[in-house]
């Protein structure tokens, strides 16, 4: 609703990040007014020097991840014993394999980071890459506008075209030919 009309804007900032943050807040039943913390925690969780190859402010990273753990530990205790609830924290509490996960803080934080980074990065990257691909291929965009029934296939194709996890690669374990293409 708040997108500018007839003027340029930053798609990643205005749509991709906002959309994924709203989705994550809904999945966690996280306070909506604090949802930007989810994006921040995702970004710092994925910013290890091992993953980025660059410099990382370790103190900021530790402080941010500590805040994430403390926030979700508080949420866990607030929801404990509550009936129903289909948010991810409530589901973890009800599953016998994860019901005591909060008592293992590093495991709890690790699982939170997997869920947050997985939900944030994959959706943000796919949505952004999809819009970029449609802008670079206007004939394909015209096909979608003419036939919205193509959209379900478009989603799968965007995920294939623009890998959701830019740092995840596939490595061939042996040379082979696949659909006429050499893979080494």
Question: What are the functions of these language-model segments?
Answer:
Residues 1-184:
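Cytochrome P450
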């Amino acid at each position: 609703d708040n997108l500018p009309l007839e003027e340029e804007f930053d798609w990643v900032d205005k749509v991709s990040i906002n959309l994924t943050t709203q989705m994550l807040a809904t999945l966690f039943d996280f306070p909506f007014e604090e949802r930007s913390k989810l994006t921040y925690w995702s970004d710092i969780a994925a910013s290890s020097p091992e993953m980025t190859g660059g410099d990382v402010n370790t103190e900021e990273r530790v402080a941010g991840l500590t805040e994430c753990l403390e926030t979700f530990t508080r949420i866990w205790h607030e929801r404990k014993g509550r009936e129903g609830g289909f948010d991810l924290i409530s589901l973890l509490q009800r599953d016998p394999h994860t019901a005591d996960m909060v008592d293992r803080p590093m495991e709890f934080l690790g699982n939170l980071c997997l869920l947050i980074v997985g939900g944030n990065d994959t959706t943000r990257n796919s949505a952004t890459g999809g819009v970029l691909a449609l802008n670079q291929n206007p004939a394909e965009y015209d096909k979608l506008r003419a036939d919205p029934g193509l959209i379900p296939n478009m989603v799968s194709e965007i995920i294939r075209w623009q890998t959701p996890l830019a740092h995840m690669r596939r490595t061939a374990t042996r040379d082979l030919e696949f659909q006429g293409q050499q893979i080494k």
